[in-house]
């Protein structure tokens, strides 16, 4: 599970291309630099207000409170899952759009959760103390146990009112406990029809300006009533002025800027090509399947757009990594860093062998990468039904263990969110499940080989489509 962080970026309009580069966590915002450069005093009070007005949707999106009674503004694609789960053959909200005339007309999104970061504590020193003088293998187990204890202590201190998550920054350079207020009742208030919300489709995606109504409105509820949210962002109809600093808060995904050259080459030579080969073909099968029936088209329309978005991202990542000048620049940056480490005896003693250790770990990783991808990461066993079955089986086994010894996704702190996702009343299209499972089993057999013990164990004498049926 990716831990998503609250970060803040600054743009200087009118040209985003002229924006200052970089994102900062709320605890590390460079207020002095911003004041010097833009003559804007970003106070701690302002940062706290922005933090409390920013929401995290548990499907990986960011939103903002836009009213004192729980209204949340987010991107249109962030509500596609909700829209798909609420739609039927008779009422397709994707093509019709949705507007709730009153709060009573708002529709609950199955399994959707929304969180607000209300506090955080750096625990780097505590983790360092818990793992001191240990081998890496033992330190890894001790680290997991310590983070689990800290999560549990955080939740106990709030009498169960808050959800706490351990967050790792900079590949272990810092550790935090993030404390969230979580809303388990999230309802759809407004969404444009897909033809407007994603106007231009894949060709227009990542082109700016883009002429689409890329927004939806949700509402957070508590105890069956709209949540009281006094910290919200006010609407300014006039919009930003040319040259005016604009600050953006959100819960972004991860970046790969800190990867070593060897890790970037692994992405270039192994991970990205394999991903693109698989998902480009899966997209093609979805495109063909959507024409088999109106229901098939409704089921995969938004998913196709999601895959096209991901394919475009990874295709351009690969294009960048195939650029010799880019790799040469990263190699130069790494060389400068290694020379700086070597020049400091203390740093050399602690980190001088880091790059060699990374190289060796990548060699080991390469030896089992495909098996891990197709088996553990379910690249060969796709679909909601398999994912739910795996969660139930593994969750049962993990809950028999002490909390500190469990896989992190099954700790007491993680279970409420896991259970809500697992038991949400989401419709499952059996024909689409067959399509996904058939495809993934075929790819598993193709990449691992028909004589792989894993393939023989899973398929036996069955063909992928027969087993999926």
Please describe what each predicted stretch is.
Residues 2, 9, 15-469:
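Terminal presequence/propeptide segments associated with secretion/organelle targeting
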């Amino acid at each position: 599970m990716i831990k998503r962080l609250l970060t803040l970026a600054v743009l200087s309009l009118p040209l985003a291309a002229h924006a200052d580069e970089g994102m900062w966590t709320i605890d590390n915002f460079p207020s002095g630099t911003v004041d010097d450069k833009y003559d804007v005093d970003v106070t701690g009070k302002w940062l706290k207000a922005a933090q409390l007005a920013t929401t995290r949707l548990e499907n990986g999106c960011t939103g903002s409170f836009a009213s004192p009674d729980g209204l949340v503004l987010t991107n249109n694609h962030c509500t596609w899952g909700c829209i798909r789960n609420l739609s039927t053959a008779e009422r397709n909200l994707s093509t019709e759009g949705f507007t709730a005339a009153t709060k009573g007309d708002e529709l609950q999104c199955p399994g959707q959760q929304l969180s607000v970061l209300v506090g955080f504590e750096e625990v780097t020193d505590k983790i360092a103390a818990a793992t001191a003088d240990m081998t890496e293998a033992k330190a890894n187990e001790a680290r997991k146990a310590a983070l689990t204890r800290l999560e549990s202590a955080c939740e106990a201190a709030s009498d169960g009112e808050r959800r706490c998550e351990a967050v790792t920054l900079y590949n272990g350079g810092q550790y935090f406990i993030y404390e969230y207020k979580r809303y388990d009742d999230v309802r759809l208030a407004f969404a444009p029809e897909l033809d407007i919300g994603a106007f231009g489709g894949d060709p227009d995606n990542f082109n700016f300006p883009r002429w689409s109504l890329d927004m939806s409105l949700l509402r957070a509820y508590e105890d069956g009533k709209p949540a009281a949210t006094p910290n919200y962002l006010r609407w300014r109809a006039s919009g930003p002025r040319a040259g005016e600093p604009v600050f953006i808060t959100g819960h972004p995904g991860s970046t790969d800027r800190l990867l070593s050259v060897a890790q970037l080459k692994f992405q270039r030579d192994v991970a990205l090509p394999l991903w693109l080969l698989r998902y480009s073909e899966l997209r093609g099968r979805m495109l063909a399947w959507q024409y088999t029936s109106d229901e098939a088209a409704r089921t995969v329309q938004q998913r196709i757009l999601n895959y096209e978005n991901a394919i475009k991202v990874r295709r351009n990542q690969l294009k960048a990594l195939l650029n010799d000048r880019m790799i040469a620049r990263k190699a130069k940056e790494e060389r400068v860093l290694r020379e700086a480490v070597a020049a400091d005896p203390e740093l050399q003693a602690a980190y001088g062998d880091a790059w060699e250790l990374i190289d060796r770990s990548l060699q080991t990783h390469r030896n089992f990468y495909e098996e891990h991808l197709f088996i553990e990461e379910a690249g060969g066993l796709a679909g909601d039904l398999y994912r739910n079955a795996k969660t139930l089986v593994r969750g049962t086994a993990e809950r028999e263990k002490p909390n500190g010894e469990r896989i992190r996704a099954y700790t007491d702190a993680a279970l409420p969110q896991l259970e809500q996702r697992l038991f949400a009343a989401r419709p499952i299209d059996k024909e689409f499940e067959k399509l996904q499972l058939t495809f993934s089993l075929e790819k598993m057999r193709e990449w691992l080989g028909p004589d792989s013990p894993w393939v023989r164990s899973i398929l036996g004498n069955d063909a992928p489509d027969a087993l999926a049926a």
